[in-house]
Amino acid sequence: MKQLRLEPVVQVRGEINIPGSKSISNRALLLATLAKGTTTLTNLLDSDDIRHMLASLKQLGVEYRLSQNNTVCELIGLGGAISADTAQTLFLGNAGTAMRPLCAALTLGRGEFTLTGEPRMEERPIGDLVDALKQLGANIVYLKNEGFPPLAINATGLNGGDVEIAGDLSSQFLTALLMVAPLAKDSVNIHVKGELVSKPYIDITLALMAQFGVQVINHDYARFEIPAGQQYVSPGKVLVEGDASSASYFLAAGAIKGGEVKVTGVGRLSIQGDVKFADVLEKMGADIEWGDDYIIARGAPLTAVDLDMNHIPDAAMTIATAALFAKGTTTIRNIYNWRIKETDRLAAMATELRKVGALVEEGHDYIQITPPAVLNTAEIDTYNDHRMAMCFSMMAFANCGITINDPDCTSKTFPDYFAQFASLKV
């Protein structure tokens, strides 16, 4: 197993241009596929999740050209649903942002499709989405365990009408349903059951759908009306803004050991909810400065917070390791959906924080972290989870440093993360 040793860092300073957002990249690729016209996507994220989406689209007959560095994609839209004359099996790795939307999109046209992935994907729920699609007439069969991939789709198009979908587990289910609803045979009325988690991710979806010319009537996130007879039309160019979750590590670095760290590609004009991570750092005592497309974090003594972080679950993970450098006990609440991500992130985070000496209480949907007087070095297991690896890079700011096991798992969203992180050292 590969290991990466991070030696203690005294101070950080610098500027990082954040790679494209994973959430926006895969949504935009799918909408461009369903749209009429050719779309040029710039600042596309070059990572495993995006490669799985691109490989699947190519297999389904979608034509596109990628730049040499894979960050510009010119894609010729189908002007409607995806159909296939021969049965297709698509391997989607552990990419939830490809599995969920493609599962929905492939019900719109004609053909037989099988969706598979890595072993962890077979543990990540998809039942709430499948139940909703079945209400609209989709024919989907589970090939192993009820409610989980792999699954088979026999596509004949989607009817419209009323549909209920659970909102309390993952916003990706609602995102997938919203993106396909305009191409159903009749108008679609989506009723959301329970509290909607990760609401800002729905805002990303709605903003992109509007960019591609589709109207959605949002009744306070409890009900969505999507009128029939709409078509996605390419806006020509789509700029993928920087990944706000990825920005969180560099902003935390600035808050803990700045100096001054500036991230570009996200800012006050961002459509991603995870930029609110900077507000949490400010509550902890960091000096934060906002621009339209940048955020600056400057170091200051940090104090603990007790916050509901349901709407920024990915960036909230960074608070868990930043808490090691804050005075007092930090509590992160309402984060049950950490448990259904790339790994059970609540259990994994609690285990690894204890290794470095923190006192940790792990609840059903919360985590409480009290830092020790002196942090210990440790070998951090990353559970094939990119965010675990990046979060624990913060331990470089302890006097003992840290060893990261399997650091290459960051390839899911940020292949050169550790090189960029190293560039901040003074």
Curated annotation (Swiss-Prot):
SUPFAM superfamilies noted in UniProt: EPT/RTPC-like
PANTHER family (UniProt xref): AROM/DEHYDROQUINATE SYNTHASE, PENTAFUNCTIONAL AROM POLYPEPTIDE
Reaction catalyzed: 3-phosphoshikimate + phosphoenolpyruvate = 5-O-(1-carboxyvinyl)-3-phosphoshikimate + phosphate
GO cellular component: cytoplasm
Biological source species: Shewanella sp. (strain MR-4)
Main location: cytoplasm
The family this protein is said to belong to: Belongs to the EPSP synthase family.
Gene label: aroA
Disulfide-linked positions: none
Location of the active site: 314 (proton acceptor)
Name the record gives this protein: 3-phosphoshikimate 1-carboxyvinyltransferase
Subcellular location: Cytoplasm
One Pfam family recorded for the sequence: EPSP_synthase
Superkingdom: Bacteria
